[in-house]
Design a protein with these regions (language model features):
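Conserved active-site loop region of the serine DD-peptidase/beta-lactamase
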Residues: 139-182
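Catalytic-loop motifs flanking and including active-site residues across diverse enzymes
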Residues: 2, 34, 69-72, 130-133, ...
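Active-site-adjacent helix/loop patches that line small-molecule binding or acyl-intermediate pockets
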Residues: 15-114, 118-124, 137-140
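Surface-exposed charge patches
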Residues: 3, 40, 154
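Short, Gly/Ser/Thr-enriched beta-strand-loop segments that form substrate-interacting elements
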Residues: 119-120, 166-199
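Active-site SXXK
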Residues: 1-11
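Active-site-proximal alpha-helical segments within enzyme catalytic domains
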Residues: 125-148, 152-153, 157, 190-199
Length: 199
């Protein structure tokens, strides 16, 4: 879902660096650091926090603390860069979401219309993928066959603390693997790993 943030030029336009890319890929713990990095993406893109459509976590004060606030901030930054509507960025027919689907279908070697639509807890469109398809996507990410995938891989490994959080599995595994393993937990108990350079 972070690919359009890079391919559109939105990430380079705001010079967000590896920290900005890492937070755009995160399922984080909602710390002050995470919220600050997500806010920074919005601020650099001249966007208001009120545009975020991810929920406010129970007991928290801001949508910036939601685990994928960085993804939503990157969605908005991309939409701003491409002059796409901001208020409807989570609609399945929004150009951003169509581009996300196109890129995923491309990596899977499928026509986009064969992808099965679903919706994430955060409100964002997502896809019902088979385990083998998830494995293939992470193999592409670890193999870094495309420039944008290499940027994402590098950013996650450079800032594992932003991808998840202190004491969390993804962060600790990426630290202890010394740049050899990418790790990202997802909803419903899914855990995806990829060996850097091999997939």
């Amino acid at each position: 879902q972070a690919l359009p943030f890079l391919s559109s030029g939105a990430a380079s336009a705001i010079d967000c660096g590896d920290r900005g890319i890492a937070i755009s890929c995160a399922s984080h713990s909602g710390s002050t650091t995470h919220a600050r990095e997500a806010f920074k993406l919005l601020w650099q893109s001249d966007l208001d926090v009120g545009l975020l459509q991810c929920p406010v976590p129970p007991g928290s004060e801001s949508a910036l603390q939601y685990n994928c606030s960085g993804k939503h901030a990157a969605f908005l930054a991309t939409s701003r860069k491409m002059s796409w509507p901001l208020e409807t960025y989570l609609q399945a027919d929004h150009p951003l979401q169509q581009e996300v689907n196109r890129r995923i279908a491309e990596l899977l070697g499928l026509p986009p219309d064969e992808l099965v639509a679903a919706r994430d807890d955060c409100g964002a469109p997502t896809l019902r993928l088979q385990l083998s398809q998830m494995a293939l996507l992470y193999a592409h990410l670890g193999g870094a066959e495309q420039a944008e995938l290499e940027q994402i891989s590098r950013a996650m490994l450079a800032h594992p603390e932003l991808v998840a959080g202190e004491g969390r599995f993804d962060t600790e595994l990426m630290r202890r693997s010394h740049g050899q393993v990418l790790s990202k937990g997802r909803a419903e108990g899914i855990q995806c790993l990829s060996r850097v350079g091999e997939g």
